[in-house]
């Protein structure tokens, strides 16, 4: 099990997706099997939330919903909160990698990745860092 110390030893996203509940259930492989069996499925949905153990920490990225409406794999992700100062970019990169993995396994093109975020924020301690990032991106 991969634990994240800064989150009070909560399970990592990787372990939540690849070993859901600590019982060896790989949810990404489940999505691939589901869409392989029914390419039009609208319920290839997985979660990082583990209600039996998540009593104080709720994962920020909580739901990944895959579908292939027209030959490309679309991914909609829901997050209740994202720290864009230090974690948002890494989250997006990893979500895109998972989308690519599923699309490749199914022989599909990668479609859009939609990220629905209830609370996107930057902490005060990261303002200077973010100003530097923005200054170099233009």
Language model features by range: what are they?
Residues 1-138:
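Terminal, non-catalytic protein-protein interaction segments that mediate quaternary/complex assembly
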């Amino acid at each position: 099990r991969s634990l994240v110390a800064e989150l009070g030893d909560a399970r990592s996203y990787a372990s939540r997706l690849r070993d859901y509940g600590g019982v060896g259930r790989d949810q990404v492989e489940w999505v691939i099997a589901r869409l392989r069996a029914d390419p039009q499925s609208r319920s290839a949905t997985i979660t990082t939330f583990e209600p039996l153990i998540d009593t104080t920490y709720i994962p920020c990225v909580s739901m990944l919903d895959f579908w292939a409406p027209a030959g490309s794999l679309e991914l909609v992700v829901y997050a209740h909160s994202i720290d864009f100062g230090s974690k948002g970019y890494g989250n997006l990169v990893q979500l895109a990698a998972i989308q690519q993995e599923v699309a490749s396994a199914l022989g599909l093109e990668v479609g859009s990745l939609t990220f629905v975020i209830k609370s996107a924020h930057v902490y005060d301690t990261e303002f200077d860092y973010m100003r530097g990032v923005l200054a170099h991106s233009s």
